[in-house]
């Protein structure tokens, strides 16, 4: 088996070649599943490379009759100048997760037209303008009235339907085994989310000198380090559902009517709270960045209220939809809560309450960990980075950091998302 | 890959034939790894079948010059008359776990001489007399002065060295993926430990009519059902270490000087507390059964004290050895607690305390679940079954059941094993 896997890997290495525009056209012509999406004539394609070139090539390919996006993984990622070797097999997990999640939630996951494992190449739906990356919309101060509803729908469906609440243990463990191989991506997360921010690490950075002491305080905070250890273990050990694995506001494309979740190359079976927390935590970051984007034309006060409302609605709608799915499928294949045991609506309701409370606290923990790492770790967010005045940026970041630290430490005290909102607002003063 | 696996499975089915004594001799002669253990002449072997014939054939094979045990898995298990189909692949996981655990703890795990996957056949060390099954020794009232020390050693080494405290995430996930395939055995555990005792199930039984109401009370105990759901999820989702998976007192062979752990066919990556709890819980069952074995010659009072002492020592020594291993290997490959983060002995000590407290509570939870299922579930223990007077047996069982229920519900309140011992004693009155 090991030998077979090795051989397969070698073949894949042999079959791999990074595409440029010319070879891309040839590739499309030779691939019916892609050619068909672009219509008959493939001689007048418009091709635009939109990847940042550091992780993947991303080509938008347009013809008179159609469009596709071609995403090809490169065998490394590049951060802060250096490149880290990184398996191209992440494309396989990205394609697998897109296909699985689209099957569960077609409204919010783009279609995969074609996957070529040897080439680490995904051909998928072009998510057309006016879709933009949600993070950019949040920076611009654009309201998305359906965002909470859509993301609640996406999270409830992808998490519920890949958990033991819906699947037999046999099916669940098959999925777990499959995604164990995406371990390189999990290790990257471990390092940048759960380790580096809490130690002196080469690539850590912060808005210096303003936040130097804040970053040092994170590295010296025993209570924080005890909490992060627990979350890190849970992240690796607990195969609760098939996660997106990187569900921040840069992995979501939006218009006022549409929400599309992309880029699940970190997909693995992990704790549900990691996905939920990523989304909520990044909304809280967006909230704290708003003062840095306020100007005379727009003080962003109304927009901040909308963000808070979106955070609150996202959790509450997720909760509602998730429990609805649970009730709807309680007599299905899932073996976690067998009807003959949880045999009254009162008891099932108690079990659900316990489950959801635990999930809520996990989400708050992971969400605050994701916030912290964006302020004192390697990868920062454009929400703050785009605030040019470093002093103002640092002030926004500090409030977010202090808020996150308090949530991480005290997460088990929160009984509702409303209480979290009040907590967030309490940090929103200079 | 799926096709390859299927083909392999078919070949294995083709290669499988249950051995009888005659074909066993031929098999041994044709297998150098076994023949060598028995010395030159293989024509005067003494063969004894000691398996119960329901799960596996177990042959003891003796020659003038040596000995082996041959264990062959059958494609079903038989319980209460009916047979359940059960993959013979459990032999593969048993052999793998024996080999892995023996590498980590050679003093307490027998050597595997030979494994034949197609035949589901393990050739291993014959654990010679005066070794007996620990459970039988406990029923006979025999003290094993080194038992706690040996089992603490076994549990500390097998659990620590297969956890993220010692291994990289990459190695850990490889192991997790491998053992995901032993899912049929996990499902059996799920059913008989975490489900059936809490519902009306065909094979449940209890010492009737004495315990009928007690069994019904378990099925109607909402608090108990909420706790068992949490443990069940943890059992399936949490890949903390490579467990034995069935570490009761029937899986341990002892003399006063030697302790050998056998039969890990339920091995999988699960929560450490499941193994620890199985051992401690079965000792508590043995404790509560003693009054049923008392007679004029031996009131078993001193023996009961020895059992309690063994429970206390087992946990305390396990705790000591486990933390010692952690300290010894804290600068190794394990990535869960990186030295640059947990960078003072005080902080590491706090982290260990938190980890061990959580593990203690898990162990109490799983241990009490294992006790409950042995009283109102399908598979009972000889400790109680061998008490002929049903009324007396029921009285012993009821005290064990009530003790277990209270531990399961209140496990997070216990701060030391000493408190648990006091709690156990408090149920030891008629």
From Swiss-Prot, chains A, B:
Induction: By sulfur starvation. InterPro entries: Aminoglycoside_PTrfase, Kinase-like_dom_sf, Methylthioribose_kinase. Pathway: Amino-acid biosynthesis; L-methionine biosynthesis via salvage pathway; S-methyl-5-thio-alpha-D-ribose 1-phosphate from S-methyl-5'-thioadenosine (hydrolase route): step 2/2. Substrate binds at residues 56, 246, 373. SUPFAM superfamilies: Protein kinase-like (PK-like). This is Methylthioribose kinase 1. Catalyzes the phosphorylation of methylthioribose into methylthioribose-1-phosphate. It catalyses: 5-(methylsulfanyl)-D-ribose + ATP = 5-(methylsulfanyl)-alpha-D-ribose 1-phosphate + ADP + H(+). Keywords: Amino-acid biosynthesis, ATP-binding, Kinase, Methionine biosynthesis, Nucleotide-binding, Transferase. It comes from the Eukaryota. GO terms for molecular function: ATP binding; S-methyl-5-thioribose kinase activity. Its EC number is 2.7.1.100. Homodimer. Belongs to the methylthioribose kinase family.
């Amino acid at each position: 088996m090991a030998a077979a896997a090795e051989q397969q890997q070698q073949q894949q290495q042999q079959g791999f070649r990074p595409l440029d525009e010319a070879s891309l056209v040839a590739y499309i012509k030779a691939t019916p599943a892609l050619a068909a999406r672009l219509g008959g004539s493939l001689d007048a394609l418009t091709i635009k490379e939109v990847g940042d070139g550091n992780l993947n090539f991303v080509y938008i390919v347009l013809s008179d009759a159609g469009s596709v996006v071609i995403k090809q993984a490169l065998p490394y990622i590049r951060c802060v100048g250096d490149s880290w070797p990184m398996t191209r097999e992440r494309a396989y997990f990205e394609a697998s997760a897109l296909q699985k999640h689209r099957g569960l939630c077609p409204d919010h996951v783009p279609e995969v037209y074609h996957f070529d494992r040897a080439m680490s190449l995904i051909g998928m739906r072009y998510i057309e303008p006016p879709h933009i990356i949600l993070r950019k919309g949040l920076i611009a101060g654009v309201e998305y009235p359906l965002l909470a509803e859509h993301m609640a729908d996406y999270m409830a469906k992808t998490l519920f339907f890949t958990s033991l609440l819906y699947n037999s243990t046999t099916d669940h463990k098959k999925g777990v085994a499959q995604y164990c191989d995406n371990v390189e991506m999990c290790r990257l997360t471990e390092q940048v989310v759960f380790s580096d921010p809490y130690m002196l690490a080469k690539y850590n950075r912060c808005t210096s000198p303003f936040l130097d002491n804040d970053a040092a305080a994170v590295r010296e905070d025993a209570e924080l380090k005890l909490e992060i250890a627990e979350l890190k273990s849970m992240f690796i050990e607990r195969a609760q559902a098939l996660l997106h694995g990187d569900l921040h506001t840069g992995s979501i494309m939006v218009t006022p009517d549409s929400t599309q979740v992309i880029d699940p190359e970190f997909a693995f079976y992990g704790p549900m709270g990691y996905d939920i927390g990523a989304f909520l935590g990044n909304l809280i970051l967006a909230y704290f960045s708003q003062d840095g984007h306020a100007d005379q034309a727009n003080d962003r006060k109304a927009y901040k209220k909308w963000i808070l409302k979106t955070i609150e609605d996202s959790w509450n709608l997720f909760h509602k939809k998730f429990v609805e799915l649970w009730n709807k499928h309680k007599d299905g294949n899932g073996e976690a809560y067998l009807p003959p045991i949880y045999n009254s609506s009162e008891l099932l309701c108690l079990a659900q309450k316990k489950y959801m409370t635990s999930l809520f606290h996990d989400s708050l923990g992971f969400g605050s960990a994701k916030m912290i790492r964006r302020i004192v770790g390697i990868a920062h967010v454009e929400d703050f980075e785009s605030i040019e005045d470093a002093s103002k940026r640092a002030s926004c970041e500090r409030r977010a950091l202090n808020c996150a630290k308090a949530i991480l430490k005290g997460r088990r005290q929160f009984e509702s998302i409303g209480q979290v909102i009040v907590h967030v607002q309490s940090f929103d003063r200079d």
